[in-house]
From Swiss-Prot:
This is Protein aurora borealis. Residues 434-458 have a biased composition (Acidic residues). The gene is bora. Residues 416-433, 522-533 have a biased composition (Basic and acidic residues). GO terms for cellular component: cytoplasm; nucleus.
């Protein structure tokens, strides 16, 4: 029994530091904001390595036993009274309060149940549900309402009438009245706007061809509102198109328009009333011709100076066998930009192809008309098989000798037109008409019936002469020269245009703007024109020929 070693519990060594209360020491305020919850390793038994023995230090009890000190009880009482009445330093106390505030505001141990919601969302784990973690749930539960009572600065009774106290400062009637007033004003403006469009012009909706167009009174056609794009369009009669709808296509009514004005605007409607007419941009108003035979109303014509509209629709045109499209040296039409006048059974400026007697099938009963003067320069596409055109070709061959004589005279006249296009227009027109007097009075009578009659206005130039007889004043070539100014160079030189329509061959002297043609191409085309002269009259497509006339 004596061999059994007894277990001795060794007392606490003096070298181990004693655990003191942090609130007792005034120097422990820097650790007050830390959490009080101890670490789990505090309860673990750990053996400290005592390789180097700590410095020996006597404890207070041992020192009291070894070195007793006589303490006066009066001093103890006085010290107790001092600590009870005296406070710590104000700076240390302020630091303590700040540390306590930081601990309870930022490092809260238990959050409030009715505080702000946490940003963490519950994770959805369908395989299992952990009872230890409340954040891991199988499905999202709806938030629960928690009734909490707290004391506020302002305490209100249960039966407190908030509207009675704050009703004078919060009025919803004023806001409602303002909204109602704004709505009424906007509805009034909308109503006026809609009434104005309903009563007059329905410009918001484009017109369709199947509307009741014949029911409109013919007098209302003169009140159509149109936008004058160019001052040169003043006085051009608007034709009645064959289609009932505006078209933005460059090909309008068998007339190709290479102008920006071919795109029509849907803002101008068919039924625009006089009260809603657009302002006329030019002091010269647009003259419009009314066609009683046409059942459709007039459509607007947005043109440029190089795109002349069709005239009156009372002319019987055989459109099945002709192609009035211009295929020439310029994308701009070679038409004269000057104004035309409406007339009965007269020439129609649908396209430059109608100027030629070959392609104009209007004069069916005039078979004794001969070509005595040359046509203006333009490129024709003749695919017609009209018998009258073939008869005209036979007369044209007999007048080739006279055409060659008039070449030199017209070349001199063209030079005068380039210098002065004002007064010389009428004089040159008279000279050209005097050359045609030796053809007979019958021919002159037919020429007057198909000629453009000039008015009293001296500013307006001479109109194009007969399309049936082929006599054209040299002013037309000058007009075409002016209409082609957009192409660049205006330096004229005398050339001769060979127009081969398949039925006849006659040279036309005009002022050409083809500056880029070389001498090789001119000589080749001259050979082609001689071969076309020797060939008999047969139907084929028109090819423009340009060669230098022999001097």
């Amino acid at each position: 029994m004596g061999d059994i070693a007894k277990i001795h519990i060794t007392p606490e060594t003096p070298a181990r530091p004693t655990i003191l209360n942090p609130f007792e020491s005034p120097n422990d305020y820097h650790r007050l904001h830390e959490s009080v919850v101890p670490s789990p390793s505090v309860f673990k038994s750990c053996k400290s390595s005592s390789a180097t023995p700590a410095k020996f230090k006597w404890s207070i009890d041992e020192m009291a036993n070894l070195l007793p000190v006589e303490i006066d009880p009066e001093d103890i009482h006085r010290q107790a009274v001092f600590f009870s009445q005296a406070r710590a330093d104000s700076e240390i106390e302020e630091k303590r309060q700040h540390a306590i505030e930081q601990f309870f505001t930022k490092g809260a141990i238990v959050p409030s149940p009715w505080g702000p919601l946490t940003s963490k969302q519950s994770m959805k784990l369908p395989h299992h549900k952990s009872p230890l973690s409340p954040l891991v749930t199988e499905e999202i539960q709806p938030p629960k309402k928690i009734n909490a009572i707290c004391q506020t600065v302002l305490s209100l009774p249960v039966d407190f009438n908030l509207e009675k106290v704050l009703g004078d400062y919060y009025k919803t009637e004023e806001l409602t009245e303002q909204v109602q007033e704004s709505l009424s004003s906007s509805s009034l403006r909308r109503k006026l706007f809609l009434d104005g469009h309903d009563s007059g012009s329905e410009s918001s909706t484009p017109s369709s061809p199947d509307r009741n167009s014949p029911s409109v009174h013919p007098s209302s056609r003169e009140l159509m509102s149109s936008a004058i794009v160019s001052p040169l369009q003043c006085g051009i009669p608007t034709g009645t198109p064959m289609s009932g709808q505006f078209s933005s296509s460059p090909i309008q009514g068998q007339c190709r328009a290479y102008s920006l004005g071919s795109v029509t605007s849907p803002m101008f409607s068919e039924r625009s009333s006089p009260a809603f007419k657009s302002p006329i941009l030019s002091p010269i108003r647009l003259q419009q011709s009314v066609t009683p035979e046409s059942g459709e109303r007039k459509r607007l014509s947005f043109l440029s100076p190089n795109c002349v509209p069709k005239g009156s629709s009372d002319i019987n045109m055989n459109r099945s066998g002709e192609s009035p499209l211009v295929e020439g040296c310029s994308p701009i039409r070679s038409c004269s930009p000057f104004q035309s006048r409406p007339r009965n059974r007269a020439c129609m400026w649908a396209s430059p192809a109608h100027i030629s007697p070959i392609l104009h099938p209007v004069l069916h009963d005039k078979e004794n008309i001969h070509i005595t003067q040359h046509l203006p320069t333009m490129d024709l596409d003749a695919t017609s098989t009209d018998p009258h055109a073939q008869q005209d070709s036979l007369h044209a061959e007999s007048s080739e000798s006279e055409a060659s004589v008039a070449v030199s005279e017209q070349m001199e006249q063209d030079e005068l037109f380039v210098k002065d296009t004002g007064e010389n227009v009428e004089t040159n027109g008279k000279e050209c008409e005097s050359d045609n007097e030796d053809e007979g009075e019958n021919e002159l009578g037919e020429e007057e019936s198909c000629a453009w009659v000039p008015e009293e206005d001296t500013a307006s130039p001479v109109r194009l002469s007969s399309t049936g007889t082929g006599s054209v004043p040299n002013a037309e070539s000058t007009h075409m020269f002016l209409s082609l100014l957009a192409e660049g160079s205006i330096t004229p030189y005398d050339t001769s245009m060979q127009v081969d329509s398949g039925y006849n061959t006659h040279s036309v002297c005009t002022t050409s703007l083809m500056d880029t043609l070389s001498s090789d191409s001119q000589s080749k085309e001259m050979l082609d024109t001689h071969t076309s002269e020797e060939s008999g009259p047969f139907t084929r497509h028109t090819k423009p020929k340009l060669f230098v006339p022999p001097h």
